[in-house]
């Protein structure tokens, strides 16, 4: 007796379910060429505005949690050395935490701090019942192994989502504390109403803290314990030949760029109507003013004329990453990430 191929029978059932569309931004989506024949520019997704809405939701969650008689969520941040960018990032995180009602403390150590001392600090914070979440600001000095330090944080307090257990659970489609930047990208896609079901996605970037988790979230079965995007995902990186990368991106419905290369993605690499999420953070010298400015991995001005959705840099994924870090802190306080 013939047996129907299981994969195809499941596919038919899943196709009947279809994609879930989020309300809001999608209703104003780019429609290619209008009746006038004029091309519409992309919807520019403001991560700043989206993050403000999420922070309001987190603030309400914190207040409700405290009203039930629970301890206020507490975030401990460890900062090593005097990297100006790291200090700026940490100040922003502390300010945002305060705004939503999360307590925070900053532990600053010199750049010559030993790995053993950092592990002692994380051990103390792990055992402290007042501490809901722990974050070690990266990068760390060369003599300190970042993976060892990240794994020294208790998984249930690892609000960055970098612990090997959290990464492992993410890859197995199980509930976990998800890396904040990957979570930010996923939240942007969902809230903007960008369809992922059955779509082709290119993730340019293979880091285990950003690119890989993004790919995991997008390709996961939407009916698993930790639902994903049901997309077909291709992962590229800084050493993917440009023509090969272009061949992939020209077929992509969604392009997510986290390679750390200014203007890696140009307009000729993007198909009409693709959604483009720029995770890049690059400081370059402005050829006109001579001043340093922040840019992403996408040629924003050119690509926005072809894309359906696009995130700017700054003001896109960055603010959302901070918001998702705060969300992880609240989840850790409630101990409901698993």
Curated annotation (Swiss-Prot):
Keyword set, alphabetical order: Amino-acid biosynthesis, Histidine biosynthesis, Hydrolase, Magnesium, Membrane, Methionine biosynthesis, Mitochondrion, Mitochondrion inner membrane, Multifunctional enzyme, NAD, One-carbon metabolism, Oxidoreductase, Purine biosynthesis
Lipid bilayer topology: Peripheral membrane protein
Binding positions (substrate): 89-93, 136-138, 314-318
Organism classification: Eukaryota, Metazoa, Chordata, Craniata, Vertebrata
EC number of the protein: 1.5.1.15, 1.5.1.5, 3.5.4.9
GO biological process: 10-formyltetrahydrofolate metabolic process; L-histidine biosynthetic process; methionine biosynthetic process; purine nucleotide biosynthetic process; tetrahydrofolate interconversion
Stored PANTHER family: BIFUNCTIONAL METHYLENETETRAHYDROFOLATE DEHYDROGENASE_CYCLOHYDROLASE 2, MITOCHONDRIAL, C-1-TETRAHYDROFOLATE SYNTHASE, CYTOPLASMIC-RELATED
Protein's pathway: One-carbon metabolism; tetrahydrofolate interconversion
GO terms for cellular component: mitochondrial inner membrane; mitochondrial matrix
Its biological purpose: Bifunctional mitochondrial folate-interconverting enzyme that has both NAD/NADP-dependent methylenetetrahydrofolate dehydrogenase and methenyltetrahydrofolate cyclohydrolase activities.
Cofactor entry: Mg(2+)
Name the UniProt record assigns to this protein: Bifunctional methylenetetrahydrofolate dehydrogenase/cyclohydrolase 2, mitochondrial
Organism: Mus musculus
Pfam family, one: THF_DHG_CYH_C
MF annotations from Gene Ontology: methenyltetrahydrofolate cyclohydrolase activity; methylenetetrahydrofolate dehydrogenase (NAD+) activity; methylenetetrahydrofolate dehydrogenase (NADP+) activity
Record localization: Mitochondrion inner membrane
């Amino acid at each position: 007796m013939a047996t129907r191929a299981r994969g195809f029978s499941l596919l038919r059932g899943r196709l009947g379910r279809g994609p879930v569309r989020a309300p809001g931004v999608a209703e104003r989506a780019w429609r290619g060429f209008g009746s006038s024949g004029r091309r519409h520019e992309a919807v520019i997704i403001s991560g700043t505005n989206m993050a403000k809405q999420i922070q309001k939701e987190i603030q309400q969650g914190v207040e409700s949690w405290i009203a039930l008689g629970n301890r206020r969520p507490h975030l401990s941040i460890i900062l090593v050395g005097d990297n100006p960018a790291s200090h700026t990032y940490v100040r922003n995180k502390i300010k945002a935490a305060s705004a939503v009602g999360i307590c925070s403390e900053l532990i600053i150590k010199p750049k010559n701090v030993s790995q053993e001392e950092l592990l002692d600090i994380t051990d103390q914070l792990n055992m402290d019942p007042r501490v809901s979440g722990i974050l070690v600001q990266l990068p760390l000095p060369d003599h300190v192994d970042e993976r060892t330090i990240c794994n020294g944080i208790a998984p249930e307090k690892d609000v960055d989502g970098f612990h090997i257990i959290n990464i492992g659970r993410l890859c197995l489609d199980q509930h976990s504390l998800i890396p904040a930047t990957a979570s930010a990208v996923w939240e942007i896609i969902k809230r903007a109403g960008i369809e992922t079901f059955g779509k082709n996605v290119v993730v340019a970037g293979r880091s285990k803290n950003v690119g890989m988790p993004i790919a995991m979230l997008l390709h996961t079965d939407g009916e698993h314990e930790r639902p994903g995007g049901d997309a077909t995902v291709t992962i590229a990186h800084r050493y993917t030949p440009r023509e090969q990368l272009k061949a992939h991106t020209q077929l992509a419905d969604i392009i997510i760029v986290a390679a750390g290369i200014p203007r890696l993605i140009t307009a000729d690499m993007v198909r009409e109507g693709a959604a483009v999420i720029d995770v890049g953070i690059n400081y370059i010298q402005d050829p006109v003013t001579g001043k340093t400015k922040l840019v992403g991995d996408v040629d924003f001005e050119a690509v926005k004329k072809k894309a359906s959705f696009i995130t700017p840099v700054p003001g896109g994924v960055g603010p959302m990453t901070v918001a998702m870090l705060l969300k992880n802190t609240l989840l850790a306080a409630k101990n409901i990430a698993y």
